[in-house]
Amino acid sequence: GSSGDDVRIAQSYLNKALGAGLTVDGRFGASTRQATEAFQAREGLSIDGVIGRTTWERLVLAFNAAL
């Protein structure tokens, strides 16, 4: 999987938007993928476990709404 700051941000956003309870470690492992899939399902997106452009845009909106 991917790793780094982008993944850390995504993990933080998934935690806030979904209550995912992920460890923010910057590693896109199985738990992060599962949380991504759950978020995609909730948002009615294609479920692929990958944070592409559309998923990212929805995640940012959901994060901001949860603030």
Where are these regions (language model features)?
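Short acidic, glycine/serine/threonine-rich helix-capping segments at coil-helix boundaries
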Residues: 1-61
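C-terminal extensions
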Residues: 65-67
